[in-house]
Regions:
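Low-complexity, charge- and small-residue-enriched intrinsically disordered regions
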Residues: 1-6, 164-168
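Membrane-embedded multi-pass helical conduit in multi-pass membrane proteins
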Residues: 94-168
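Tryptophan-centric aromatic hotspots in well-structured domains and transmembrane helices
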Residues: 9-10, 79, 159
Length: 168
C-alpha cells in the first residue's frame, strides 16, 4: 500500500475484518493451490476498500524460509502459476514489467560479454534498485544485506526468468 499502489501482501502479516473475508468468499480463486491473501487484496481494491501499510518494525511477522533451493524454487513457481488468475490491472502490469525488465537485463548481461557498453544498463538498474532497497533494509535492521545487492542483481533476472517460465 506504499504509494497508494498495493500489489502484494503476505497472509502471515495481513489484517482484515471478518465481514470483508465473508464478502470475498465467492471471489477467491478456488482453482489455485494458494493465494487467498493476494486474491483477497485484489478484492479489497476492487470494492475500493481501504488498504494501508503498517510501517512499524514491531508489526513484522517472520515466517520460515524454504529448507532447500529446490523447495524455494517450487514455492516461487507455485506463486507464479497463480498469476494466471490475477485480474488486478496494477498487479498484472507490475508482473509484466518485472518480467520484461528481467529479460532485458539478462540479455544485456550476455551482450556485455561482447560489448562493455551494455554494463551501463546493469549499473543504472543497480542504482535504481539500491535506491529502493537500501532504505527498507536500514528500516528493517538488515543493513548487513546491503553488500549483497550487486551480486544478487546479476542473479535476479535469471531467477525471475526461470521462475516465470517454470510457473506458466
Amino acid at each position: 500500500a506504499l504509494g497508494k499502489f498495493p500489489i502484494m501482501c503476505n497472509g502471515a502479516n495481513l489484517v482484515f475484518s471478518r465481514r470483508i473475508w465473508d464478502k470475498a468468499q465467492n471471489r477467491l480463486v478456488d482453482t489455485e493451490a494458494s493465494g487467498d491473501d493476494i486474491f483477497l487484496l485484489h478484492y479489497i481494491k476492487e470494492i475500493k476498500g481501504r488498504v494501508v501499510y503498517f510501517k512499524d518494525i514491531d508489526g513484522f511477522v517472520e515466517t520460515l524460509a524454504a529448507d532447500t533451493l529446490h523447495a524455494f524454487y517450487n514455492q516461487r513457481k507455485r506463486w507464479t502459476s497463480k498469476s494466471r488468475s490475477y485480474t488486478d490491472v496494477q498487479t498484472v502490469f507490475v508482473a509484466l514489467l518485472v518480467t520484461l525488465t528481467s529479460i532485458t537485463m539478462a540479455a544485456s548481461m550476455i551482450a556485455a560479454i561482447f560489448d562493455s557498453k551494455f554494463i551501463l544498463l546493469w549499473l543504472i538498474k543497480l542504482v535504481i534498485d539500491s535506491a529502493l532497497l537500501i532504505p527498507f533494509l536500514l528500516f528493517s535492521h538488515q543493513k548487513y544485506l546491503i553488500g549483497y545487492i550487486p551480486f544478487l542483481s546479476v542473479i535476479y533476472p535469471f531467477y525471475i526468468i526461470m521462475t516465470v517460465f517454470g510457473g506458466l
